[in-house]
Amino acid sequence: MRTLTCVPDESTAKVHTCRAPFMLHRVMIPPDPIQRFAELFERAKQAIAVDPNAMVVATVGDDGRPSARVVLLKDFDARGFVFYTNHESRKGREARAHPYAALCFYWQPLNEQVRVEGRVERVTDAEADAYFQSRARGSQVGAWASLQSQPLATREELEARVAEVEQKYAGQPVPRPPHWSGFRVVPDRIEFWHAQESRLHDRHVYLREDGGWRTQMLYP
């Protein structure tokens, strides 16, 4: 793990003096980016105790303004990267209206970053149902109670909605709300970044072409 060191500066508001040493490491380039991601993700799970599957998801609105937030990756395979959400949330509305998104993983203990770009598609109902039933009951209730991204007057209003849902489904399974499902980001571009000394980082991008992947190094 890198230790961040900040050189004393006359202003505590400045962070440009913060530096971290990097482990020199030559990156092997497998032909399949999903395989490469899977190997890195296994290392991240060993190195990061809390939420190694955290990622930034960026979408764009009708006005062209991007929005980004941290969510949890719930599944990935050759088809793409899956997360779940309320489809009436801001990210849900934007992903449906403009079905492209960007993801970013940053695993600081590994000196690794992965960026994913691609088309967004909805997961199947069977996939969404299976994942929803694996969630804690409180999270299932919350999926019904929360009008995600809508204005909320008081915390008590939310708690009252939670109580109503709990009463409605007392003693029985909580079904998946029709507005709650998953999105799969189908990648057409995946970039791997590995930190090196003097900011001469390793960057390799995979571009989907003719049903396969073409790799290309990039200047840091």
From Swiss-Prot:
Keywords: Flavoprotein, FMN, Oxidoreductase, Pyridoxine biosynthesis. Its cofactor is FMN. It holds the Pfam family PNPOx_N. GO terms for molecular function: FMN binding; pyridoxamine phosphate oxidase activity. It is an enzyme of class 1 (oxidoreductase). PROSITE patterns: PYRIDOX_OXIDASE. Substrate binds at K74, Y131, R135, S139, R199, L200, H201. Its EC number is 1.4.3.5. This is Pyridoxine/pyridoxamine 5'-phosphate oxidase. Binds 1 FMN per subunit. SUPFAM superfamilies: FMN-binding split barrel. Belongs to the pyridoxamine 5'-phosphate oxidase family. The lineage of its organism: Bacteria, Pseudomonadati, Myxococcota, Myxococcia, Myxococcales. Homodimer. Catalyzes the oxidation of either pyridoxine 5'-phosphate (PNP) or pyridoxamine 5'-phosphate (PMP) into pyridoxal 5'-phosphate (PLP). The keyword ATP-binding does not apply. FMN binds at residues 69-74, 84-85, 90-91, 113, 148-149, 193, 203. Pathway: Cofactor metabolism; pyridoxal 5'-phosphate salvage; pyridoxal 5'-phosphate from pyridoxamine 5'-phosphate: step 1/1; Cofactor metabolism; pyridoxal 5'-phosphate salvage; pyridoxal 5'-phosphate from pyridoxine 5'-phosphate: step 1/1. InterPro entries: Pyridox_Oxase, Pyridox_Oxase_CS, Pyridox_Oxase_N, Pyridoxamine_oxidase_dimer_C, Split_barrel_FMN-bd. It catalyses: pyridoxamine 5'-phosphate + O2 + H2O = pyridoxal 5'-phosphate + H2O2 + NH4(+); pyridoxine 5'-phosphate + O2 = pyridoxal 5'-phosphate + H2O2. GO terms for biological process: pyridoxine biosynthetic process.
